Amino acid sequence: MRGQEDGFLAPLCYAPLGVSASRRLPVYYLPMARDLASLVDTLAEIVGPRHVRTALPERLTYAKDGLPTHRRVPGVVVLPGNRDEVIAIVRLLGALGMPFVPRGAGTGLSGGALADGDAVLIVLTRLNRILKIDARNRLAVVEPGVVNVRLSLAAAPHGLQYTPDPSSQTACTIGGNVAENAGGPHCLKYGVTATHVLALEVALADGRVVELGSPGGEPWGPDLVGLFVGSEGNFGVATRITVRLLPVARAVRTLLADFTSLRTAGEAVSAVIASGIVPAALEMMDQSCIRAVEDSVYAAGYPRDAAAVLLAELDGGHEAAVTADAETIEAVLRAHGARAVRVAADAQQRERLWLGRKKAFGAMGRLSRDLVVQDAVVPRSTLPDVLETIARIAAEYGLTVSNVFHAGDGNLHPNISFDGRTPGLRERVEAASAEIMATCIAAGGTITGEHGIGLDKLRYMPLLFDGDSLAAMRAVRRVWDPEERVNPGKVVPVHACREWSGVRNAEWGVRSGTSPVDSALRTPHSALDAEAGVR
Protein backbone atom coordinates (compact mmCIF):
# COMPACT_ATOMS: atom_id res chain seq x y z
CA MET A 1 0.00 0.00 0.00
CA ARG A 2 1.31 3.40 -0.93
CA GLY A 3 2.64 5.21 2.14
CA GLN A 4 2.50 2.18 4.42
CA GLU A 5 5.41 2.02 6.84
CA ASP A 6 5.84 -0.49 9.66
CA GLY A 7 2.14 -1.23 9.93
CA PHE A 8 1.09 2.40 9.74
CA LEU A 9 -0.21 4.53 6.96
CA ALA A 10 1.59 7.70 6.10
CA PRO A 11 0.14 10.73 7.90
CA LEU A 12 -2.95 12.09 6.23
CA CYS A 13 -3.39 15.84 5.99
CA TYR A 14 -6.45 17.59 4.74
CA ALA A 15 -7.51 21.16 4.24
CA PRO A 16 -11.12 22.32 4.51
CA LEU A 17 -12.59 23.95 1.47
CA GLY A 18 -11.18 27.41 0.97
CA VAL A 19 -8.18 26.81 3.28
CA SER A 20 -4.74 26.89 1.74
CA ALA A 21 -2.24 24.07 2.14
CA SER A 22 -0.17 26.23 4.48
CA ARG A 23 -3.06 26.21 6.98
CA ARG A 24 -3.71 22.48 7.01
CA LEU A 25 -5.43 21.01 10.03
CA PRO A 26 -3.62 18.78 12.56
CA VAL A 27 -2.37 15.49 11.17
CA TYR A 28 -3.83 12.14 12.18
CA TYR A 29 -1.72 8.97 12.01
CA LEU A 30 -3.90 6.09 10.96
CA PRO A 31 -2.93 2.64 12.26
CA MET A 32 -3.90 -0.38 10.22
CA ALA A 33 -6.44 -1.35 12.91
CA ARG A 34 -5.84 -5.08 12.65
CA ASP A 35 -8.32 -5.55 15.47
CA LEU A 36 -11.16 -3.70 17.09
CA ALA A 37 -9.04 -2.32 19.92
CA SER A 38 -6.68 -0.43 17.64
CA LEU A 39 -9.61 0.99 15.65
CA VAL A 40 -11.33 2.13 18.83
CA ASP A 41 -8.11 3.69 20.11
CA THR A 42 -7.68 5.66 16.90
CA LEU A 43 -11.29 6.82 16.90
CA ALA A 44 -10.85 7.90 20.52
CA GLU A 45 -7.83 9.99 19.50
CA ILE A 46 -10.03 11.79 16.99
CA VAL A 47 -13.21 12.40 19.02
CA GLY A 48 -12.20 11.65 22.61
CA PRO A 49 -12.89 8.41 24.52
CA ARG A 50 -16.32 9.60 25.74
CA HIS A 51 -17.60 9.68 22.20
CA VAL A 52 -16.75 6.14 21.13
CA ARG A 53 -19.30 3.52 22.18
CA THR A 54 -18.35 -0.16 22.23
CA ALA A 55 -20.28 -1.65 25.15
CA LEU A 56 -23.20 -3.78 24.01
CA PRO A 57 -25.89 -1.85 25.94
CA GLU A 58 -24.67 1.39 24.32
CA ARG A 59 -24.62 -0.14 20.86
CA LEU A 60 -28.10 -1.60 21.33
CA THR A 61 -29.35 1.97 21.69
CA TYR A 62 -28.64 2.39 17.98
CA ALA A 63 -29.92 -1.02 16.81
CA LYS A 64 -33.23 0.35 15.51
CA ASP A 65 -34.69 3.50 14.05
CA GLY A 66 -38.30 4.66 14.28
CA LEU A 67 -39.46 1.45 12.56
CA PRO A 68 -39.21 -1.53 14.95
CA THR A 69 -39.23 -4.15 12.20
CA HIS A 70 -35.48 -4.19 11.57
CA ARG A 71 -32.67 -4.60 14.07
CA ARG A 72 -28.94 -4.25 13.37
CA VAL A 73 -26.34 -3.90 16.13
CA PRO A 74 -23.37 -1.76 15.00
CA GLY A 75 -19.84 -2.91 15.76
CA VAL A 76 -18.69 0.52 16.92
CA VAL A 77 -20.55 3.79 17.43
CA VAL A 78 -18.66 7.07 17.12
CA LEU A 79 -20.05 10.56 17.74
CA PRO A 80 -17.91 13.27 16.13
CA GLY A 81 -18.31 16.82 17.39
CA ASN A 82 -17.42 18.83 14.29
CA ARG A 83 -16.87 18.49 10.56
CA ASP A 84 -13.11 18.07 10.93
CA GLU A 85 -13.66 15.01 13.11
CA VAL A 86 -16.16 13.62 10.61
CA ILE A 87 -13.64 13.98 7.81
CA ALA A 88 -10.89 12.38 9.89
CA ILE A 89 -13.13 9.42 10.74
CA VAL A 90 -14.20 8.92 7.14
CA ARG A 91 -10.60 9.10 5.96
CA LEU A 92 -9.57 6.57 8.58
CA LEU A 93 -12.27 4.14 7.56
CA GLY A 94 -11.53 4.74 3.90
CA ALA A 95 -7.87 3.91 4.41
CA LEU A 96 -8.88 0.72 6.21
CA GLY A 97 -11.56 -0.21 3.69
CA MET A 98 -14.19 -0.38 6.41
CA PRO A 99 -17.92 0.19 5.85
CA PHE A 100 -19.73 2.91 7.78
CA VAL A 101 -23.22 4.30 8.16
CA PRO A 102 -24.07 7.97 8.84
CA ARG A 103 -26.99 8.49 11.24
CA GLY A 104 -28.95 11.43 12.56
CA ALA A 105 -31.56 11.23 15.30
CA GLY A 106 -32.74 7.76 14.29
CA THR A 107 -36.33 8.81 13.60
CA GLY A 108 -36.35 7.27 10.12
CA LEU A 109 -38.98 4.71 9.17
CA SER A 110 -37.20 2.42 6.72
CA GLY A 111 -34.26 0.91 8.61
CA GLY A 112 -32.05 3.14 6.52
CA ALA A 113 -29.60 4.25 9.22
CA LEU A 114 -28.82 0.86 10.76
CA ALA A 115 -25.32 -0.63 10.74
CA ASP A 116 -24.33 -4.29 10.87
CA GLY A 117 -21.66 -5.51 13.27
CA ASP A 118 -18.85 -5.08 10.76
CA ALA A 119 -19.71 -1.41 10.14
CA VAL A 120 -18.98 1.74 12.10
CA LEU A 121 -22.00 3.90 12.88
CA ILE A 122 -21.20 7.63 12.64
CA VAL A 123 -23.81 9.50 14.69
CA LEU A 124 -23.98 13.16 13.70
CA THR A 125 -26.20 14.60 16.44
CA ARG A 126 -23.32 16.51 18.07
CA LEU A 127 -22.90 18.52 14.87
CA ASN A 128 -25.84 20.67 15.89
CA ARG A 129 -24.82 24.25 15.21
CA ILE A 130 -26.73 26.75 13.13
CA LEU A 131 -23.70 28.36 11.53
CA LYS A 132 -25.44 31.28 9.86
CA ILE A 133 -28.84 32.80 9.23
CA ASP A 134 -28.65 35.25 6.36
CA ALA A 135 -32.00 37.04 6.55
CA ARG A 136 -31.20 39.34 3.65
CA ASN A 137 -30.60 36.45 1.27
CA ARG A 138 -33.11 34.19 3.02
CA LEU A 139 -30.79 31.28 3.65
CA ALA A 140 -29.21 29.40 6.52
CA VAL A 141 -26.08 27.29 6.87
CA VAL A 142 -26.38 24.42 9.33
CA GLU A 143 -24.59 21.32 10.48
CA PRO A 144 -26.33 18.00 9.83
CA GLY A 145 -27.32 17.38 13.45
CA VAL A 146 -29.48 20.50 13.78
CA VAL A 147 -33.01 19.49 14.80
CA ASN A 148 -35.51 20.52 12.15
CA VAL A 149 -37.77 22.70 14.29
CA ARG A 150 -34.80 24.53 15.85
CA LEU A 151 -34.01 26.10 12.51
CA SER A 152 -37.49 27.58 12.14
CA LEU A 153 -37.38 28.83 15.74
CA ALA A 154 -34.03 30.49 15.08
CA ALA A 155 -35.29 32.05 11.85
CA ALA A 156 -38.59 33.27 13.32
CA PRO A 157 -37.22 36.58 14.72
CA HIS A 158 -36.31 37.44 11.12
CA GLY A 159 -39.83 36.66 9.91
CA LEU A 160 -38.55 33.52 8.19
CA GLN A 161 -39.07 29.78 8.45
CA TYR A 162 -37.75 26.46 7.16
CA THR A 163 -40.85 24.96 5.58
CA PRO A 164 -40.22 21.17 5.37
CA ASP A 165 -42.04 19.92 8.47
CA PRO A 166 -41.99 16.14 9.00
CA SER A 167 -44.17 14.87 11.83
CA SER A 168 -40.95 14.15 13.74
CA GLN A 169 -39.68 17.71 13.29
CA THR A 170 -39.13 18.19 17.03
CA ALA A 171 -36.58 15.35 16.94
CA CYS A 172 -35.39 14.68 13.37
CA THR A 173 -32.29 16.39 12.00
CA ILE A 174 -31.68 18.40 8.86
CA GLY A 175 -29.01 15.90 7.80
CA GLY A 176 -31.50 13.05 8.08
CA ASN A 177 -34.06 15.12 6.18
CA VAL A 178 -31.51 15.57 3.39
CA ALA A 179 -30.76 11.84 3.29
CA GLU A 180 -34.44 10.92 2.97
CA ASN A 181 -35.66 13.99 1.06
CA ALA A 182 -38.17 14.41 3.87
CA GLY A 183 -41.50 16.08 3.32
CA GLY A 184 -44.26 16.84 5.78
CA PRO A 185 -47.79 18.23 5.64
CA HIS A 186 -46.80 21.57 4.12
CA CYS A 187 -44.78 20.07 1.27
CA LEU A 188 -47.98 20.17 -0.80
CA LYS A 189 -47.46 23.89 -1.40
CA TYR A 190 -43.84 24.43 -0.44
CA GLY A 191 -42.13 21.26 -1.66
CA VAL A 192 -39.99 18.60 -0.03
CA THR A 193 -36.44 18.97 1.27
CA ALA A 194 -34.86 18.96 -2.20
CA THR A 195 -36.73 22.15 -3.02
CA HIS A 196 -35.01 23.97 -0.19
CA VAL A 197 -31.41 22.72 -0.25
CA LEU A 198 -29.14 25.17 -2.05
CA ALA A 199 -25.68 23.76 -1.37
CA LEU A 200 -23.91 20.94 0.43
CA GLU A 201 -20.46 20.20 1.74
CA VAL A 202 -19.99 16.44 1.52
CA ALA A 203 -17.32 14.04 2.75
CA LEU A 204 -17.06 11.28 0.17
CA ALA A 205 -16.36 7.65 1.03
CA ASP A 206 -12.59 8.14 0.93
CA GLY A 207 -12.65 11.38 2.92
CA ARG A 208 -12.34 13.81 0.06
CA VAL A 209 -14.49 16.88 0.60
CA VAL A 210 -16.57 18.32 -2.22
CA GLU A 211 -18.95 21.25 -2.54
CA LEU A 212 -22.23 20.75 -4.36
CA GLY A 213 -24.47 23.56 -5.55
CA SER A 214 -24.11 27.18 -4.54
CA PRO A 215 -25.69 29.45 -1.92
CA GLY A 216 -27.11 31.55 -4.73
CA GLY A 217 -29.19 28.59 -5.78
CA GLU A 218 -28.48 29.09 -9.47
CA PRO A 219 -27.75 25.63 -10.93
CA TRP A 220 -24.94 25.01 -13.35
CA GLY A 221 -23.81 21.69 -14.74
CA PRO A 222 -25.34 18.46 -13.44
CA ASP A 223 -27.69 18.87 -10.49
CA LEU A 224 -25.50 17.11 -7.93
CA VAL A 225 -27.43 18.60 -5.02
CA GLY A 226 -30.59 17.04 -6.40
CA LEU A 227 -28.76 13.74 -6.81
CA PHE A 228 -27.43 13.75 -3.25
CA VAL A 229 -30.68 14.75 -1.55
CA GLY A 230 -32.67 11.57 -1.07
CA SER A 231 -29.66 9.27 -1.61
CA GLU A 232 -30.23 7.78 1.87
CA GLY A 233 -26.63 8.10 2.98
CA ASN A 234 -25.27 6.03 0.07
CA PHE A 235 -23.15 8.80 -1.44
CA GLY A 236 -21.30 10.26 1.54
CA VAL A 237 -21.77 12.39 4.64
CA ALA A 238 -23.17 15.91 4.45
CA THR A 239 -21.11 18.04 6.83
CA ARG A 240 -22.63 21.45 6.05
CA ILE A 241 -25.99 22.22 4.51
CA THR A 242 -27.18 25.51 3.03
CA VAL A 243 -30.96 25.79 2.91
CA ARG A 244 -33.52 28.26 1.65
CA LEU A 245 -35.69 30.12 4.17
CA LEU A 246 -39.11 31.51 3.31
CA PRO A 247 -41.19 34.28 4.87
CA VAL A 248 -43.64 33.27 7.57
CA ALA A 249 -47.15 33.60 6.16
CA ARG A 250 -48.96 36.68 7.44
CA ALA A 251 -52.38 35.09 7.14
CA VAL A 252 -53.39 31.50 7.87
CA ARG A 253 -56.72 29.67 7.83
CA THR A 254 -57.07 26.10 9.09
CA LEU A 255 -60.16 24.00 8.37
CA LEU A 256 -61.28 20.61 9.66
CA ALA A 257 -63.85 18.75 7.55
CA ASP A 258 -65.37 15.43 8.59
CA PHE A 259 -66.90 12.76 6.39
CA THR A 260 -69.10 9.71 6.82
CA SER A 261 -67.04 7.55 4.44
CA LEU A 262 -63.43 7.21 3.35
CA ARG A 263 -64.47 7.21 -0.30
CA THR A 264 -66.22 10.56 0.01
CA ALA A 265 -63.21 12.05 1.78
CA GLY A 266 -60.91 10.74 -0.96
CA GLU A 267 -63.11 12.23 -3.66
CA ALA A 268 -63.11 15.57 -1.87
CA VAL A 269 -59.31 15.68 -2.02
CA SER A 270 -59.32 15.67 -5.82
CA ALA A 271 -62.09 18.27 -5.83
CA VAL A 272 -60.04 20.62 -3.65
CA ILE A 273 -57.01 20.43 -5.93
CA ALA A 274 -59.21 20.77 -9.02
CA SER A 275 -60.59 24.03 -7.64
CA GLY A 276 -57.34 25.70 -8.68
CA ILE A 277 -56.38 26.63 -5.13
CA VAL A 278 -53.40 24.71 -3.75
CA PRO A 279 -53.63 24.52 0.05
CA ALA A 280 -50.46 24.76 2.10
CA ALA A 281 -51.48 21.38 3.54
CA LEU A 282 -54.24 18.83 3.03
CA GLU A 283 -54.10 15.89 5.46
CA MET A 284 -56.40 12.92 6.05
CA MET A 285 -57.00 10.71 9.09
CA ASP A 286 -59.40 7.78 9.26
CA GLN A 287 -61.58 6.74 12.19
CA SER A 288 -59.06 4.37 13.73
CA CYS A 289 -56.44 7.12 13.79
CA ILE A 290 -58.95 9.74 14.98
CA ARG A 291 -59.92 7.62 17.97
CA ALA A 292 -56.31 6.83 18.83
CA VAL A 293 -55.54 10.56 18.91
CA GLU A 294 -58.67 11.43 20.89
CA ASP A 295 -57.86 8.73 23.48
CA SER A 296 -54.36 10.14 23.97
CA VAL A 297 -52.87 13.23 25.60
CA TYR A 298 -52.87 14.77 22.11
CA ALA A 299 -56.68 14.92 21.87
CA ALA A 300 -57.53 17.65 19.36
CA GLY A 301 -61.32 17.64 19.37
CA TYR A 302 -61.69 15.52 16.24
CA PRO A 303 -65.20 13.99 15.81
CA ARG A 304 -64.90 10.40 17.03
CA ASP A 305 -67.80 9.18 14.90
CA ALA A 306 -66.35 10.46 11.61
CA ALA A 307 -65.13 7.90 9.08
CA ALA A 308 -62.42 10.39 8.09
CA VAL A 309 -61.36 13.99 8.55
CA LEU A 310 -59.51 16.33 6.23
CA LEU A 311 -57.26 18.98 7.76
CA ALA A 312 -56.75 21.77 5.23
CA GLU A 313 -54.63 24.87 5.64
CA LEU A 314 -54.47 27.99 3.47
CA ASP A 315 -51.84 30.66 3.91
CA GLY A 316 -50.43 33.72 2.19
CA GLY A 317 -49.39 37.31 2.49
CA HIS A 318 -52.81 38.97 2.40
CA GLU A 319 -55.61 38.38 4.87
CA ALA A 320 -58.43 39.04 2.42
CA ALA A 321 -57.05 36.70 -0.23
CA VAL A 322 -56.47 33.86 2.24
CA THR A 323 -59.95 34.32 3.70
CA ALA A 324 -61.47 34.16 0.23
CA ASP A 325 -59.51 31.01 -0.61
CA ALA A 326 -60.58 29.39 2.65
CA GLU A 327 -64.22 30.16 1.92
CA THR A 328 -63.86 28.62 -1.54
CA ILE A 329 -62.29 25.46 -0.13
CA GLU A 330 -64.97 25.22 2.55
CA ALA A 331 -67.64 25.40 -0.14
CA VAL A 332 -65.88 22.71 -2.19
CA LEU A 333 -65.65 20.41 0.83
CA ARG A 334 -69.32 20.84 1.66
CA ALA A 335 -70.32 20.29 -1.96
CA HIS A 336 -68.38 17.02 -2.01
CA GLY A 337 -69.85 15.38 1.04
CA ALA A 338 -68.37 17.02 4.12
CA ARG A 339 -70.76 16.54 7.03
CA ALA A 340 -69.33 19.59 8.78
CA VAL A 341 -66.48 22.05 8.30
CA ARG A 342 -64.90 23.81 11.24
CA VAL A 343 -62.57 26.81 10.86
CA ALA A 344 -59.99 27.36 13.61
CA ALA A 345 -60.93 30.60 15.35
CA ASP A 346 -57.44 31.50 16.53
CA ALA A 347 -53.83 30.35 16.71
CA GLN A 348 -54.52 28.23 19.78
CA GLN A 349 -57.23 26.22 18.03
CA ARG A 350 -55.04 25.85 14.96
CA GLU A 351 -52.13 24.55 17.05
CA ARG A 352 -54.41 22.05 18.77
CA LEU A 353 -55.69 20.69 15.46
CA TRP A 354 -52.14 20.33 14.17
CA LEU A 355 -50.83 18.77 17.38
CA GLY A 356 -53.26 15.90 16.95
CA ARG A 357 -52.08 15.34 13.38
CA LYS A 358 -48.38 15.65 14.17
CA LYS A 359 -48.59 13.28 17.13
CA ALA A 360 -50.84 10.73 15.43
CA PHE A 361 -48.04 8.20 15.02
CA GLY A 362 -47.25 8.41 18.72
CA ALA A 363 -50.92 8.09 19.59
CA MET A 364 -51.17 4.91 17.53
CA GLY A 365 -48.69 3.36 19.93
CA ARG A 366 -51.68 2.93 22.24
CA LEU A 367 -53.32 0.47 19.85
CA SER A 368 -50.82 -2.38 20.23
CA ARG A 369 -47.21 -3.13 21.08
CA ASP A 370 -46.05 -3.29 17.44
CA LEU A 371 -46.66 -1.00 14.49
CA VAL A 372 -45.75 -1.35 10.82
CA VAL A 373 -45.58 2.09 9.23
CA GLN A 374 -46.08 2.05 5.47
CA ASP A 375 -45.31 4.77 2.95
CA ALA A 376 -46.50 4.86 -0.65
CA VAL A 377 -47.72 7.40 -3.19
CA VAL A 378 -50.70 7.04 -5.53
CA PRO A 379 -52.35 9.46 -7.97
CA ARG A 380 -54.90 11.58 -6.09
CA SER A 381 -57.70 10.42 -8.36
CA THR A 382 -57.17 6.83 -7.23
CA LEU A 383 -57.39 7.57 -3.49
CA PRO A 384 -61.03 6.42 -3.06
CA ASP A 385 -60.42 3.04 -4.71
CA VAL A 386 -57.04 2.48 -3.06
CA LEU A 387 -58.37 3.29 0.41
CA GLU A 388 -61.25 0.86 -0.07
CA THR A 389 -58.86 -1.84 -1.25
CA ILE A 390 -56.60 -1.30 1.76
CA ALA A 391 -59.63 -1.67 4.04
CA ARG A 392 -60.57 -4.90 2.26
CA ILE A 393 -57.04 -6.29 2.60
CA ALA A 394 -57.02 -5.47 6.31
CA ALA A 395 -60.36 -7.22 6.80
CA GLU A 396 -59.23 -10.31 4.89
CA TYR A 397 -56.17 -10.64 7.13
CA GLY A 398 -58.04 -9.74 10.31
CA LEU A 399 -55.87 -6.67 10.93
CA THR A 400 -56.36 -3.08 12.05
CA VAL A 401 -55.10 -0.47 9.60
CA SER A 402 -54.98 3.20 10.60
CA ASN A 403 -54.57 5.77 7.84
CA VAL A 404 -52.96 9.15 8.46
CA PHE A 405 -51.35 10.74 5.45
CA HIS A 406 -50.60 13.65 3.13
CA ALA A 407 -53.76 13.44 1.05
CA GLY A 408 -53.01 16.46 -1.11
CA ASP A 409 -50.19 14.71 -2.95
CA GLY A 410 -51.44 11.15 -2.51
CA ASN A 411 -48.71 10.16 -0.04
CA LEU A 412 -50.32 7.30 1.90
CA HIS A 413 -49.32 6.03 5.35
CA PRO A 414 -51.40 2.92 6.08
CA ASN A 415 -50.21 1.69 9.48
CA ILE A 416 -50.84 -1.79 10.86
CA SER A 417 -51.04 -2.26 14.63
CA PHE A 418 -50.40 -5.77 15.95
CA ASP A 419 -48.82 -7.84 18.71
CA GLY A 420 -45.83 -9.64 17.25
CA ARG A 421 -45.88 -12.18 20.07
CA THR A 422 -49.05 -13.73 18.65
CA PRO A 423 -48.09 -16.84 16.63
CA GLY A 424 -48.50 -16.31 12.90
CA LEU A 425 -49.57 -12.69 13.20
CA ARG A 426 -46.31 -11.17 11.99
CA GLU A 427 -46.52 -13.28 8.84
CA ARG A 428 -50.05 -12.03 8.19
CA VAL A 429 -48.94 -8.45 8.69
CA GLU A 430 -46.10 -8.79 6.20
CA ALA A 431 -48.31 -10.50 3.64
CA ALA A 432 -50.92 -7.74 4.01
CA SER A 433 -48.21 -5.08 3.72
CA ALA A 434 -46.99 -6.65 0.49
CA GLU A 435 -50.51 -6.63 -0.96
CA ILE A 436 -50.95 -2.99 0.03
CA MET A 437 -47.71 -2.07 -1.74
CA ALA A 438 -48.72 -4.05 -4.81
CA THR A 439 -52.09 -2.27 -4.80
CA CYS A 440 -50.41 1.14 -4.76
CA ILE A 441 -48.10 0.19 -7.61
CA ALA A 442 -50.99 -1.18 -9.67
CA ALA A 443 -52.77 2.15 -9.18
CA GLY A 444 -49.87 3.92 -10.87
CA GLY A 445 -48.06 4.80 -7.67
CA THR A 446 -44.70 4.12 -6.10
CA ILE A 447 -43.40 2.47 -2.93
CA THR A 448 -42.22 5.49 -1.00
CA GLY A 449 -42.94 9.18 -0.78
CA GLU A 450 -40.71 10.33 2.04
CA HIS A 451 -39.63 7.45 4.30
CA GLY A 452 -37.12 6.06 1.82
CA ILE A 453 -36.21 2.54 0.73
CA GLY A 454 -33.62 1.64 3.36
CA LEU A 455 -33.92 -2.00 4.33
CA ASP A 456 -37.68 -2.01 4.57
CA LYS A 457 -38.57 -1.50 0.91
CA LEU A 458 -35.70 -3.41 -0.71
CA ARG A 459 -37.86 -6.35 -1.61
CA TYR A 460 -40.32 -4.14 -3.48
CA MET A 461 -37.76 -2.51 -5.76
CA PRO A 462 -38.04 -5.18 -8.49
CA LEU A 463 -41.76 -4.46 -8.71
CA LEU A 464 -40.95 -0.99 -10.00
CA PHE A 465 -37.61 -1.39 -11.77
CA ASP A 466 -36.16 -3.99 -14.08
CA GLY A 467 -32.61 -5.25 -13.83
CA ASP A 468 -31.20 -2.64 -16.21
CA SER A 469 -32.69 0.18 -14.14
CA LEU A 470 -31.40 -1.26 -10.87
CA ALA A 471 -27.96 -1.75 -12.41
CA ALA A 472 -28.00 1.90 -13.54
CA MET A 473 -28.80 3.02 -10.00
CA ARG A 474 -25.96 0.94 -8.67
CA ALA A 475 -23.60 2.40 -11.25
CA VAL A 476 -24.51 5.92 -10.12
CA ARG A 477 -23.81 4.95 -6.55
CA ARG A 478 -20.39 3.59 -7.51
CA VAL A 479 -19.42 6.95 -8.97
CA TRP A 480 -19.71 8.38 -5.45
CA ASP A 481 -18.62 5.29 -3.54
CA PRO A 482 -16.77 2.80 -5.77
CA GLU A 483 -16.39 0.20 -3.01
CA GLU A 484 -19.98 0.61 -1.78
CA ARG A 485 -18.83 1.09 1.81
CA VAL A 486 -21.19 3.93 2.74
CA ASN A 487 -24.45 2.59 4.19
CA PRO A 488 -24.03 -0.76 2.43
CA GLY A 489 -26.95 -3.02 1.64
CA LYS A 490 -29.56 -0.28 1.41
CA VAL A 491 -31.80 1.13 -1.33
CA VAL A 492 -30.66 -0.99 -4.30
CA PRO A 493 -30.77 -4.82 -4.10
CA VAL A 494 -27.34 -5.86 -5.33
CA HIS A 495 -27.91 -9.60 -5.76
CA ALA A 496 -29.92 -11.45 -8.35
CA CYS A 497 -33.55 -11.19 -7.44
CA ARG A 498 -33.96 -14.98 -7.34
CA GLU A 499 -31.25 -15.35 -4.69
CA TRP A 500 -32.10 -12.15 -2.84
CA SER A 501 -35.80 -13.02 -2.61
CA GLY A 502 -35.06 -16.13 -0.62
CA VAL A 503 -32.88 -14.25 1.85
CA ARG A 504 -35.43 -11.50 2.37
CA ASN A 505 -38.37 -13.88 2.66
CA ALA A 506 -36.53 -15.85 5.32
CA GLU A 507 -35.86 -12.66 7.26
CA TRP A 508 -39.42 -11.40 6.99
CA GLY A 509 -41.02 -14.79 7.55
CA VAL A 510 -42.96 -14.61 4.28
CA ARG A 511 -43.66 -17.93 2.60
CA SER A 512 -42.79 -18.18 -1.05
CA GLY A 513 -45.80 -17.52 -3.21
CA THR A 514 -47.93 -15.92 -0.50
CA SER A 515 -48.06 -12.44 -2.03
CA PRO A 516 -47.77 -10.66 -5.39
CA VAL A 517 -44.31 -9.49 -4.34
CA ASP A 518 -42.91 -13.01 -4.19
CA SER A 519 -43.77 -13.70 -7.82
CA ALA A 520 -42.19 -10.45 -8.90
CA LEU A 521 -39.05 -11.15 -6.91
CA ARG A 522 -38.56 -14.47 -8.69
CA THR A 523 -38.40 -12.71 -12.06
CA PRO A 524 -34.80 -12.88 -13.37
CA HIS A 525 -33.07 -9.60 -14.12
CA SER A 526 -30.11 -10.47 -16.29
CA ALA A 527 -28.41 -7.09 -16.15
CA LEU A 528 -28.35 -7.12 -12.36
CA ASP A 529 -27.23 -10.75 -12.30
CA ALA A 530 -24.31 -9.91 -14.56
CA GLU A 531 -23.48 -6.84 -12.49
CA ALA A 532 -23.34 -8.93 -9.33
CA GLY A 533 -21.39 -11.70 -11.02
CA VAL A 534 -24.15 -14.23 -10.37
CA ARG A 535 -24.19 -17.35 -12.50
Residue ranges of model-derived segments:
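Activity-critical C-terminal alpha-helical subdomain
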Residues: 208, 458-500
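A glycine- and small-aliphatic-rich helix-loop capping segment at beta-alpha/alpha-beta transitions
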Residues: 110-128, 156-160, 183-194, 242-247, ...
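C-terminal substrate-recognition/cap domain of FAD-linked oxidoreductases
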Residues: 53-63, 243-247, 253, 258-432, ...
